[in-house]
Design a protein with these regions (language model features):
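Short, polar/acidic, helix-capping and beta-turn segments at strand->helix junctions
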Residues: 2-129
Length: 129
């Protein structure tokens, strides 16, 4: 009923969870785990603050979706977690680069007390086809 999706093109899980789960018997749906802006090759955050971390987080999601045969155009819902809600506009600017006009997924965004590894932003996505 479901398949674990894993790719070395996104960071390995930092806890007991999968990068993503694809549900294919009901329909073709993928649920990614929250992606910090970690560079897969190093496990470190890129230089450049919240913008660089947001970009890397979305690149990680893109890589996971690709492993499942999907693209960012398949994303129907995202959740954005921010260490500081004052970074909302900065993250929005990067986020908009990843989605075609008119194909913006539903989204929720929240400030949280802290993110793993001291991250500034974490994004999760649901994709469907």
């Amino acid at each position: 009923m479901s398949n674990v999706i894993a790719t070395p093109k996104a960071p390995a899980a930092v806890g007991p969870y999968s990068q993503a789960i694809q549900v294919s018997e009901v329909s073709d749906i993928i649920f990614t785990s929250g992606q910090l802006g970690l560079v897969p090759e190093t496990g470190d955050f890129p230089e450049g603050g919240v913008e660089a971390q947001a970009r890397q987080s979305l690149e990680n999601i893109k890589a996971i979706l690709s492993q499942a045969g999907m693209t960012m155009a398949n994303v129907v819902k995202t959740t954005v977690l921010l260490a500081d809600i004052a970074d909302f506009a900065k993250v929005n600017a990067i986020y908009a680069e990843f989605f075609a006009d008119g194909a913006l997924p539903a989204r929720s965004a929240f400030q949280v007390a802290a993110l793993p590894k001291g991250g500034l932003v974490e994004i999760e996505a649901i994709g469907a086809r």
